[in-house]
């Protein structure tokens, strides 16, 4: 940071407080940046900032020159490291029930699995909810075979990043933490060896006729 810059830190459960504080500073004439990991519009701060603006009746907030700059979300970063597992239709689902009922998550998982969509899971597990990934996998296994490919990307783009490919039959909640992005392949997702000893994972662009 430069000497004239000030950092305002909050934890990940204070998004709305951070967004409102940013508008208060910006409305007073300060230049403000709300920093968010990944892409700010994907399970990140852009939605909180817009929600704060939408709820506000402060005319000064409405006059703030607000811009949202895209980034690389964890699903895209992990997919790029693995190859192209998101090469066909896919969906992104947060398994956190902090802001939505678990019943809604179950419904979305059921329909996504039945539609044979590739799925990328954000917030797959935490100390407060260690059971949810296991419950999600039970739903998915009703529609997907044990040989379905799975990609686990942990801290992709950061020091110490790890990438692992395994099958749905091999996946257990113990292999995942809150910093892991989980990609569940479709029936068409496949893999083949790389010359360096690794492997590529991709989902073909076409889908066989039903």
Label each residue range with its predicted role.
Residues 41-115:
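Class I SAM-dependent methyltransferase SAM-binding "motif I" and its flanking Rossmann-like core
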Residues 6-9, 66-68, 92, 150-152:
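Conserved beta-strand scaffold positions in the cores of enzyme catalytic domains, especially
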Residues 21-28, 80-84, 105-109, 163-169:
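Short, surface-exposed amphipathic charged segments that create phosphate/polyanion-binding patches used
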